[in-house]
Amino acid sequence: MKKKRDIADVLTDIRIARNRLRIMKTKIEGRLTQQESLSRSAVLTKEYIKEAEQLKKISEFLDTLDIILELIEIKVETIIYIGYIVNDAPAVLEALRELKKNGEFLSPELSALVDDIYNGFYSAINVPSEIKISASKEAKKVLDEAKTIAKYRESGKNIDINT
């Protein structure tokens, strides 16, 4: 029963991280709206446009991170409900690690949460080394899929997540 509690803690961390992402995203969207309105009327238009572009990049990164966390959340829920590991769950975790490595927009708070999720998953679940090795190779595909899903969601189109 100890493993179920540990994996439940990972699920809680995932949900906390997703809520914090939503809060950050809302703040960024508000700031972006403000920058866009200022860039229409101010003398410092170039600076406002540059900041707006940076805010859009941060927003896209947060969207991708949210998609990966959503995928992990689904995988962890499945593990809790059926009692054994889903084969592609480690690939999604490795994608989270890759995103963190490349994520210049990750705040220290979110970085710590991502580390807790990653380490908590592997401490709660005994993953065979051959699955972990293949997961590292598949992580790039998962990351690309998450970016594609984030773009679709941003455009207002719905896309099903392949779990």
Language-model segment annotations:
Residues 1-33, 51, 67-163:
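Long C-terminal interaction segments enriched in charged/acidic composition
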Residues 26-63:
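N-terminal interaction modules that seed assembly of large macromolecular complexes
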